[in-house]
Amino acid sequence: MVNVPKTRRTFCKKCGKHQPHKVTQYKKGKDSLYAQGKRRYDRKQSGYGGQTKPIFRKKAKTTKKIVLRLECVEPNCRSKRMLAIKRCKHFELGGDKKRKVCYAWKVQPCL
């Protein structure tokens, strides 16, 4: 499981220095009905003759790459940028940090 904090101090290109950034997970927007490929597809599909293009069924990957959206918290800046991280099955944003478990019968003290 990947746990990412909700804020991160990192370089802002617009400010030109390290600033705190608000971290959110990128989500794909709604597909446009007026993109050239969609217009062509809809035109081809209309009328008689069933499905005209192959429907993709051989999915290879079980995970997606996680993309973080970093937004500068400076009120005058608010610039946004994307940061891709590795693939993972479980992604968590701002979850609880792992704590070291301390048992009473251990000789060394826990730090």
Curated annotation (Swiss-Prot):
Entry's Gene Ontology molecular function annotations: structural constituent of ribosome
Residues passing through the membrane, by range: none
Location of the protein in the cell: Cytoplasm
One GO CC annotation: cytosol
A single BP term in Gene Ontology: translation
Residue sites binding Zn(2+) per the record: C12, C15, C72, C77
Top-level taxonomic group: Eukaryota
Keywords: Cytoplasm, Ribonucleoprotein, Ribosomal protein, Zinc
Entry's family note: Belongs to the eukaryotic ribosomal protein eL42 family.
Complex formation: Component of the large ribosomal subunit.
Function per UniProt: Component of the large ribosomal subunit. The ribosome is a large ribonucleoprotein complex responsible for the synthesis of proteins in the cell.
Protein name from the UniProt record: Large ribosomal subunit protein eL42
Organism: Oryctolagus cuniculus
Taxonomic lineage from the root: Eukaryota, Metazoa, Chordata, Craniata, Vertebrata
